[in-house]
Amino acid sequence: MGDSKVKVAVRIRPMNRRETDLHTKCVVDVDANKVILNPVNTNLSKGDARGQPKVFAYDHCFWSMDESVKEKYAGQDIVFKCLGENILQNAFDGYNACIFAYGQTGSGKSYTMMGTADQPGLIPRLCSGLFERTQKEENEEQSFKVEVSYMEIYNEKVRDLLDPKGSRQTLKVREHSVLGPYVDGLSKLAVTSYKDIESLMSEGNKSRTVAATNMNEESSRSHAVFKITLTHTLYDVKSGTSGEKVGKLSLVDLAGSERATKTGAAGDRLKEGSNINKSLTTLGLVISALADQSAGKNKNKFVPYRDSVLTWLLKDSLGGNSKTAMVATVSPAADNYDETLSTLRYADRAKHIVNHAVVNEDPNARIIRDLREEVEKLREQLTKAEAMKSPELKDRLEESEKLIQEMTVTWEEKLRKTEEIAQERQKQLESLGISLQSSGIKVGDDKCFLVNLNADPALNELLVYYLKEHTLIGSANSQDIQLCGMGILPEHCIIDITSEGQVMLTPQKNTRTFVNGSSVSSPIQLHHGDRILWGNNHFFRLNLPKKKKKAEREDEDQDPSMKNENSSEQLDVDGDSSSEVSSEVNFNYEYAQMEVTMKALGSNDPMQSILNSLEQQHEEEKRSALERQRLMYEHELEQLRRRLSPEKQNCRSMDRFSFHSPSAQQRLRQWAEEREATLNNSLMRLREQIVKANLLVREANYIAEELDKRTEYKVTLQIPASSLDANRKRGSLLSEPAIQVRRKGKGKQIWSLEKLDNRLLDMRDLYQEWKECEEDNPVIRSYFKRADPFYDEQENHSLIGVANVFLESLFYDVKLQYAVPIINQKGEVAGRLHVEVMRLSGDVGERIAGGDEVAEVSFEKETQENKLVCMVKILQATGLPQHLSHFVFCKYSFWDQQEPVIVAPEVDTSSSSVSKEPHCMVVFDHCNEFSVNITEDFIEHLSEGALAIEVYGHKINDPRKNPALWDLGIIQAKTRSLRDRWSEVTRKLEFWVQILEQNENGEYCPVEVISAKDVPTGGIFQLRQGQSRRVQVEVKSVQESGTLPLMEECILSVGIGCVKVRPLRAPRTHETFHEEEEDMDSYQDRDLERLRRKWLNALTKRQEYLDQQLQKLVSKRDKTEDDADREAQLLEMRLTLTEERNAVMVPSAGSGIPGAPAEWTPVPGMETHIPVIFLDLNADDFSSQDNLDDPEAGGWDATLTGEEEEEFFELQIVKQHDGEVKAEASWDSAVHGCPQLSRGTPVDERLFLIVRVTVQLSHPADMQLVLRKRICVNVHGRQGFAQSLLKKMSHRSSIPGCGVTFEIVSNIPEDAQGVEEREALARMAANVENPASADSEAYIEKYLRSVLAVENLLTLDRLRQEVAVKEQLTGKGKLSRRSISSPNVNRLSGSRQDLIPSYSLGSNKGRWESQQDVSQTTVSRGIAPAPALSVSPQNNHSPDPGLSNLAASYLNPVKSFVPQMPKLLKSLFPVRDEKRGKRPSPLAHQPVPRIMVQSASPDIRVTRMEEAQPEMGPDVLVQTMGAPALKICDKPAKVPSPPPVIAVTAVTPAPEAQDGPPSPLSEASSGYFSHSVSTATLSDALGPGLDAAAPPGSMPTAPEAEPEAPISHPPPPTAVPAEEPPGPQQLVSPGRERPDLEAPAPGSPFRVRRVRASELRSFSRMLAGDPGCSPGAEGNAPAPGAGGQALASDSEEADEVPEWLREGEFVTVGAHKTGVVRYVGPADFQEGTWVGVELDLPSGKNDGSIGGKQYFRCNPGYGLLVRPSRVRRATGPVRRRSTGLRLGAPEARRSATLSGSATNLASLTAALAKADRSHKNPENRKSWAS
């Protein structure tokens, strides 16, 4: 007897896929025979035991983790060498031997014991080695016999894996005093070769219980024990005696120990798991007890062998008569640390177990003798017992006799018995029509059979069903092939084999039978390799061996080339040469399943045909593109020939822009390949998921129908929520199947695939219970009614959509205020989230620039210093769909935050809960600050990533059920959305031209521009003869004019030419106007026409499609709920389409649609009409639609009238301005060969040229843009001294240059071209009712293309956010040049007006760039707003309209006392051309006027005034101040006193190096003093300078302004007096026309006081609180209640109406305006009689209504109300200019409404106005109420 300890080995397996995906680290290492387990948590303190590595020593340690580490790696051969060879030797020596593997699920036990075909494990190697050795050693002196048995222990029950009868019956375990524990009835089969063992083992494995768990896809769910008995017989030839040694090998493969949480076990899996764990726990306890015994701790300790079947059967192997080896298998991953530690501890304990092995020599003789003695003893006992009454004794006797019989069976008998069992098995299965394959038993060549295809890869093709001549298939017992499961009827199908050998399949009525994916309802012939589906999931493949061999022979006879051609047609079915039923890769379970689904979807593989059609389309596009390219090259060659002819040699440079680059083809190919690969990949993955979804839906529908749940499931498609996140990885799935659940009478629900999958488990259980229950039991019946996994009565929140805020703005020191689109899972914008993101501290830029220096700083210090603190504000969500707007909340995670931030809305309890609006708004007012360590990853995230904010809402009833579907509100909302969509593809761009001439100092200064009524180009440039000139061009985007991401980089070229001389045109009246006269302005409508044609085409196509679809639906008889929904949707879209068509044909003013009449008042120098330039880019990616290469230059074809390409001369650019898109080009006007340009322009002629520039754009596409501007120039000769002096003394025009505003349109808005709602598309793409329909392909393709748009939405929005940030940076850069920035009161919210609530949102003052509503801004564009609006500092490009009226106010103050006004001063009152006050003045960096009030005071002598004069100096000092300080007097003073006068001087700040137009406050102006200043003008003019600080010490400043007149209780200067009716305050100057008021004498004493701007309330704020000053509805009428004082000077005007003045009369208003009288009568706004005139030209102020009252009707901008005295009779017919597209840019002018002014000042103003009538715009008349 040899005592030996259990040999223990540990094996470490490689990482599996799950662990690799988790990126878990390796914690196990091997050093010789030691295993080191490192701690997972390295952050523990040094003294903590958990932080120390644990070391275990074993007999063998196998490192199988990484094959590349050759010196360490232990493969299967090394494991066998160390353990197997020793055990094999023990078996030959006659010892019992055992080897078992122990470890958690998936640790590699089965691999170590059984291995794979390529890498066999311990058991196959032991068996193979056993037979190799027996064959070697067998001779006449010794022989070997081998017997095997194979059993499994499953759920504590023992099953025989080699029993052919009923493999499911369980066997009993018994214990015998002699034999020990054994299994009663376990088959023991004799084997003669390794092949026999292999086949038996394979057969057993197939019967073994295997199932997938999370840890391991083919996890053993049972313990398997393979026993080999080796009988070694020794013959002594001499003596003739023989002896036997018997060795027993027990090879045990244990099931994995597991944790339910990790393996995801549930239901049966959990039950199995608990039993597996029970056996293994008992095994552990047995090992512990035996280890304790061996260590001598507790010799008598009880060993609980019988607590589990496993340990009972292993009793001999553990601590008994056996030599045992144990392999502990562990995972190296940190994720499995606890399990690994537990396994290593058990293995460590097992080392101490001592076994007592003895050699089993000649056991038979001894055992038989013992047994015989026992039998005799039992017989005696039985005889003594009465009449065999003891059943126990009888059992024991039978047991012993049976054992003796088994012992005495000869070897030959054993072999015969094994053969009989095999034959019996074959017969039994054949009787069932089944044959078990791969067991070494050959299938008959002549038999036809079916092979099963199974979802479980381990069970695939295990069953073979033989077909008889007439085979019945069904679920009844009488059928030949019995199938059970869903969809199988008792009699399902019949298969017949005809005499010719053909196989015919005949399905029964109403059965579900498919052949090769197609449904079958009539008899059909089957062929070799056909796939058959019966019911829901019984898939089979047919094998016809004869047919197959015949085909093979024909194949060999065929010509090789023919063979290749046909190979594809044979479907690779016949590559079956190795085995009749070998696994055919092409026809596995998944293939068969997919085939059925694809056929059901309408074609064998719709995706394939989609790709083919795409390919064809692509080829055609390529062909047509090449044809276009050829034509373009020819065109270009022709142009080159023309250009290079000798007389035109210097015409223009060729590098305007190139149409194509040589790499065009290559780039196109690369782009197409990438796009095709993405589409292909997406289609493939989507196809797989659709297949799965359709299978689940089919099953769910079947169960729901069976249980009468009235619920229907359909597959639809949606965009995965992860794909809406801009941070997602590229190439992720664009779309995924979702399940639409609909219950009769209830709304729709959308479930995810996972949800249906989980629900199906409940449905199946319910179905099974329903099948098994008694139908007549009322309790059961009510239970089935209540149990409802089929539909959710209460739905949780749904995802409305995801808003992506790109974080690039955190690199800059600006606040990003933006309305981010919320994109839903249909790929549509479902609203906007108003967000602010801002960096509070930390500098990302410096860290990047720091480079290596930063790296040198210690890490701790670095993390402390480099922190970025930013603020995220979520203000509100607007435009949300009504049916999802309940309990809306947001969720987002910022960078590495562990927990997501949940943002709840602010609840306003006062407002009603139900809103009638189709769209809702939710206020959050959430603000959060985040502090993040700046790392390389974080910087990358900032530059590439976005903050994805998910917006959720709770659904209310099905929106389609709402009666409000046809509400006008919904149609209006759609029209509003049309306006918004246009605003997303448009942006206005200003193009300014200045001509610079060299002055006496050699500097280039802008020439003067004078406006003229007959010149529509914005003004006439006054050039001097013989001067050196430059053309300065500037291009800039207009803020808040649309959200197209338009960014100009630089000006590439400047050209000038096309000189046209025109006679001076008389002012346009009805007599002189001819429609055919060409307009010499910069307007053209070529691009507009092109855009309209394209849009109309798109609408027409869409209309045809909608009509066709509606027709289909109308003609359909049985409409489903889906059809009714779709019909309603289509009708709604058809209605919206009509609105849209009207919008194209006749866009309403201010609608924001290109070509709509403009509603604006252009600044001086700007043209009235706005031409459109259509870039025609691809809506998807802003690439060109027509060209292979870069987009052609936008606007190249938009030529002006009279433009000739040959007449242009390219100018050399001599200066580019940094930070602005501005360039100067040198211009020699002599090259044009035009005498009027060289020697001077005659007085009666106008000279026009065209300036053309090419601008490089970076956004929306990298392309060029061609802009043209027509200019008018006047060249005058050299002036004499008198003229020069006069010129210097007279006023210089304030117009800096001429400009034109373009409306740039990138493309037709995407949704305008969209055909059908994506929801409907998705549903139709996933389900097509008619399989023959070609629509299925179209729907899927259409849907996928619409889904691809999401990526474009994100890309575009990223561009918009970039542009918003860059514009803020530019604005900031400009502002920083000024000392203090002025308050920007005029910033309007660009968010939808209809969504803005009545309450304010705190800081919600910024513009929301992305949701600009062009037509609904706060100030109506048809009117000039009240003077309250200060000037926005963004656009530093136009003179402020107001400053023109101040032009005279900086002249020598001494002259102000001269009572008589010289005629020379007429020119000092230029045209009052004011606009809304949006544009800032270029004067922001120039001398800013400061105004001082001089109050009359009798006690101060004139000498004080004279003393004050030297202080002021020649330059005039002007101080900005608010309105109240400008008000001179509230009422006419009773005692006549000298009126106050405003002294104005200029403060010149430090000169700036900036080329700009000279200030109208020029020092060169003459020294006269202005007698008239308008308050409105002052506020507008001085807006930008409100905060400009005066140089300290320039003048003494008094603490407050003195009262203006000696009134007893003077009001404070900052308050509006109560006794005066509210109204715009005006300042007027004394005049000489009123004889009752004296003009001031030159010697009047004045005291000069300084008024500080800080002491005055801002004019805007004062007006904001003054109800009379809010902008009127139309026109700037004086507010009601202004009373007679509002027009003080009108008291002198006669209100008598001449007899001829009646409605319909043709009249002249002022000097130039003509029109028809439409109204004569009183008005609400002012007493007296007023005349309403409809003008011929849009130079009016309104549409006939003022203050909300309609006096007459006309087009906006054509109406005017005046006093009767301003109207005189005209002669001739009425004419009206009508060019359709140029209707409307009303040249609105604001007049100075006089109120509360001293009468003497008013009269002087009136006099000046009359004196200036011939020169001034008549619109500046005081009596107009406009």
Swiss-Prot record:
Protein name: Kinesin-like protein KIF13B
Similarity comment: Belongs to the TRAFAC class myosin-kinesin ATPase superfamily. Kinesin family.
Subcellular localization, as worded in the UniProt entry: Cytoplasm, Cytoskeleton; Cell projection, Axon
Annotated Kinesin motor domain residues: 5-353
Domain FHA residues, every copy: 471-535
Amino acid composition bias (Low complexity), ranges on this chain: 1579-1607, 1671-1688
CDD domains: FHA_KIF13B, KISc_KIF1A_KIF1B
